[in-house]
């Protein structure tokens, strides 16, 4: 029996349909990669499959009783929750009991705690958890937190972007899902975590639909590729390499068919312009066919071309871009940068790598002057024009129109 069926689905924002009577079926054990251009509707489709978003028309059927995990592209978490509380929050009605049991257990270890009151509450919680047979949920939550190398007592608000992504994956996997929906699961993850996630998904019997732009991840994990292209879903068995070969042929066939259609339409347009009124009356069927051809051509959505982007170098800066001298930075007891020195010069292209939570973003902010070092000095060069794209895109005004963000104060982009 299928785990999921999407039937005759339509969804539009504005005048362009993201889904145009789309069809999709997910069978047990499949790992389907959902691909397509940015903005084509992949995340909207995944939200609809997860029951987090509504379709304009059509339906989503899920196997009754199926356990489902969903990880959105930017998971929303309460920053005041602990990692353990955030993970068990996805476990339904027992989540509050488990979170309180975890909190009371830790409170008993605090100096000056009211042991008698806390012990009474702990016994009451134990009884409720036993009545709901919920101990397996706690052990599963602890196992998955450990597998993702997270501190169960850490506050969500203190986590790095990569650690928050690990947390979202842990929350989804803690319910041992039959169906897993993942939107950009490799975003913010370090190289080791991506490789670990690949092995986890490949070895799992769970049915998976995932969105990613990571080609290696696509090739290793997927058993089927589904492309969302101009509102329709094109399915291709196998991995991304197999899909690329098939897609090239599909695009060639489409181009040939469109060229034939356009040539025939042009011939009919010539005929209708040259024909006298009497001929049009005798050939009413041909006139009606031409009108239908015009409607079909107007409805056809041609494939978008590739973006051509040229970056201006701007005003030439000094040779020195930034210099850090014996810089150190800590957060509480955790040392992130220790006695670090470097010099960045004009034209350098540097890749900064390291495990999640190691301090890569902190180092960038130290270089930019957004953070002050605890020790040492950080200075920027002269005549710099800095473009900073942070992982959470906080520099973007989400209420502004797109044209105002890309080209403020101008009516066009050159």
Task: Annotate each predicted stretch with a short phrase.
Residues 1-258, 309, 313-414:
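ABC ATP-binding cassette signature C-motif
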Residues 126-127, 275-278, 285-288, 306-314:
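Alpha-helical segments in transporter systems
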Residues 246-289, 293-300:
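Intracellular alpha-helical coupling/juxtamembrane segments of multi-pass membrane proteins
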Residues 298-302, 306, 376:
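Active-site phosphate-binding and catalytic loops of NTP-dependent enzymes
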């Amino acid at each position: 029996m299928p785990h999921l069926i999407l039937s005759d689905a339509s969804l539009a924002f504005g005048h362009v349909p993201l889904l145009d009577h789309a069809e999709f079926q997910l069978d047990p054990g499949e790992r389907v990669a959902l691909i397509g251009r940015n903005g084509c509707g992949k995340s909207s489709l995944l939200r609809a499959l997860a029951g987090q978003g509504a379709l304009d028309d059509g339906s989503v059927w899920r196997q009754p009783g199926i356990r489902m995990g969903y990880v959105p592209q930017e998971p929303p978490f309460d920053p005041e929750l602990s990692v353990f509380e955030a993970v068990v929050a996805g476990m339904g009605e027992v989540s509050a009991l488990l979170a309180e049991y975890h909190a009371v257990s830790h409170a008993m270890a605090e100096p000056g705690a009211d042991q008698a009151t806390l012990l009474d509450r702990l016994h009451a919680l134990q009884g409720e958890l036993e009545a709901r047979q919920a101990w397996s949920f706690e052990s599963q939550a602890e196992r998955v937190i450990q597998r993702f190398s997270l501190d169960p007592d850490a506050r969500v608000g203190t986590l790095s972007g990569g650690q928050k992504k690990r947390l979202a994956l842990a929350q989804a996997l803690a319910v041992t899902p039959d169906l897993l929906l993942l939107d950009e699961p490799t975003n913010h993850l370090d190289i080791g975590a991506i490789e670990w996630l690949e092995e986890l998904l490949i070895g799992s019997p769970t049915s998976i639909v995932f969105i990613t732009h990571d080609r290696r991840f696509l090739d290793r994990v997927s058993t089927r590729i589904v492309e969302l292209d101009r509102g329709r879903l094109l399915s291709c068995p196998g991995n991304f390499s197999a899909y690329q070969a098939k897609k090239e042929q599909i695009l060639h066939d489409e181009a040939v068919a469109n060229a034939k259609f356009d040539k025939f339409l042009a011939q009919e347009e010539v005929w209708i312009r040259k024909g006298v009124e009497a001929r049009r009356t005798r050939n009413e069927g041909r006139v009606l066919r031409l009108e239908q051809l015009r409607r079909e051509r107007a409805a056809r959505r041609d494939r978008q071309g590739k973006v051509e982007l040229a970056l201006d170098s701007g005003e030439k800066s000094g040779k020195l871009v930034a210099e850090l001298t014996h810089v150190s930075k800590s957060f509480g007891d955790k040392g992130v940068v220790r006695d670090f020195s470097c010099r960045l010069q004009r034209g350098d292209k540097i890749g900064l790598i390291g495990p999640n939570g190691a301090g890569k973003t902190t180092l960038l902010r130290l270089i930019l002057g957004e953070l002050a070092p605890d020790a040492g000095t950080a200075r920027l060069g002269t005549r710099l024009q800095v473009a900073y794209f942070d992982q959470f895109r906080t520099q973007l005004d989400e209420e502004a129109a797109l044209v105002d963000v890309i080209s403020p104060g101008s009516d066009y982009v050159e």
